[in-house]
Amino acid sequence: MPRGFLVKRTKRSGSSYRARPVEPLFPPPGPLAAQSSPEEPGRGLLGSPCLAPPQDDAEWGAGGGDGPGPSPARPAGPELRRAFLERCLRSPVSAESFPSATAFCSAAPAAVTSGEELVPPQVPVSVPIPVPGPAPHGLQRRGKGAPVCASAPAAVRKPKAVRRLSFADEVTTSPVLGLKIKEEEPGAPARALGGVRTPLGEFICQLCKHQYADPFALAQHRCSRIVRVEYRCPECDKVFSCPANLASHRRWHKPRPTPACAASKPPHAPLTPPDPSLATGKENGRVPRTDDQHPQAPDSSGDGQHRDSAARPGLQALVYPEAARPQAPYPEVILGRHGPGSSGASAGATSEVFVCPYCHKKFRRQAYLRKHLGTHETGSARAPTPGFGSERTAPLTFACPLCGAHFPSADIREKHRLWHAVREELLLPALVGAPSEAGPGGASDGSAQQIFSCKYCPSTFFSSPGLTRHINKCHPSESRQVLLLQMPLRPGC
């Protein structure tokens, strides 16, 4: 809040209420005033004490006599008049209303010395205009000299108020990422001055200076000076709005060579050279990703690669038998490992292929093939396809010495032999004195008890409904023929 905002505006001066010694306004007429004039010529102007020595009746005599006056009512004495004037001058109201009482007091004796009678004032005398001079300290603070002092800061602030902001767009970078502002053409219309206001209803683009009738049209306006900056990847044609994003993206295109991949890549180069415009071996390239992007770990069983080279033609053609090999739980022939370039289909591949000997599925890793072989072990005993031949299938699997069924592992074969032992114990009383069984799926021609054997597995049942339930549950119709092809006819026990 500014200083003096709530101060009551009056004409009162800022002088204090302290009474100052002043000269008496009306010195006594007569010889006393005449005597004081020659003795003290400058006392009336400089000011003197207002209280004079008491002189009662000598002042009012016509000829200066001591007798009483002719009037029956004695006029007021000079002391009473002086006390009245002093009381009026000492009051706060008169001190504030008449700040120039000193000048009035100094001018009054000069008028009285001419010999006029003293008359008490009936009407308040108008305040004379004070002569400009050194004002009191209080008046200097609150006087009208304050605007003079404030004019110096106003002169300093004047250039700031006069300064006009220039809105000419010299910036060529947009705050929106990926946008750039073109430089203004020399022939473009200049913008109106800051003092000139555009009429209402006109909306002007600040860049191209086009005017529109409503703000919606201005918002939909596509300025010709705003250009979209695109940073395109030279290898995959992806577009980015920031060069840093493009640099981060291009790191994915860097090749990832490994010593093993570099050693095996020259002999297995592709037959047709790739297009030089397309990126090869890139993760985001348009060509299909090859296996070199994530090279396989070197196989620890690579020492037997040349040893299997003679077996590959037999496995691919499925016609020629293979030489016998020592039996093992998972021999290398079962894994069906094929090196690169073993056939026309795998000529372009740079990784090894592992073929399952039962279903001829191909796998890239040996671990995948081992996991797949576990699915063949879960079912009943199954032999390879007849195309392999009995000579070829014997060393590949574990054959049952009783019925000739082949199994991929010794554990499954032992379970199968347990079925033979249980069946012999059950059928021994019924087969005593009876001829041999008619066939694998028939019933024995013996006496009371009849035996039903499954055609697809070595399971045996004593009733036809039990065999039917077993066939419907364990050998569904879609896989019966496949199982029949894989399962050779076994001789009767």
Curated annotation (Swiss-Prot):
Tissue-specificity statement: Expressed in spleen, stomach, liver, kidney and testis. In the pancreas, expressed in islet cells, including insulin-producing beta-cells, but not in acinar cells (at protein level). In the brain, expressed in the neuronal cells of the cerebral cortex, the Purkinje cells of the cerebellum and the hippocampal region including CA1 and CA3 (at protein level).
GO cellular component terms attached to this protein's record: cytoplasm; nucleus
Chain positions covered by the region annotation Disordered: 1-77, 248-310
InterPro entries the UniProt entry points to: INSM1/2, Znf_C2H2_sf, Znf_C2H2_type
Keywords: Cytoplasm, DNA-binding, Metal-binding, Nucleus, Repeat, Transcription, Transcription regulation, Zinc, Zinc-finger
Conditions for induction: Up-regulated by NEUROG3 and NEUROD1.
Pro residues: bias regions: 267-276
SMART domains: ZnF_C2H2 (SM00355)
GO biological process: cell differentiation; negative regulation of DNA-templated transcription
Biased composition regions of type Basic and acidic residues, renumbered to the chain: 283-294
Comp. bias intervals (Basic residues): 1-12
PROSITE patterns membership: ZINC_FINGER_C2H2_1, ZINC_FINGER_C2H2_2
Zinc finger (C2H2-type) in chain: 203-223, 231-253, 354-376, 398-420, 452-475
Coiled coil start-end: none
GO molecular function terms listed in the Swiss-Prot or TrEMBL record: DNA binding; DNA-binding transcription factor activity; transcription corepressor activity; zinc ion binding
Chief location bin: cytoplasm
Compartments it resides in: Cytoplasm; Nucleus
Tagged with keyword Metal-binding: yes
Pfam families: zf-C2H2
Presence of the UniProt keyword Electron transport in the record: no
Annotated spans, SNAG domain: 1-20
Free-text function comment from the UniProt entry: May function as a growth suppressor or tumor suppressor in liver cells and in certain neurons.
Name under which the protein is recorded: Insulinoma-associated protein 2
Organism in which the protein naturally occurs: Mus musculus (Mouse)
Lineage: Eukaryota, Metazoa, Chordata, Craniata, Vertebrata
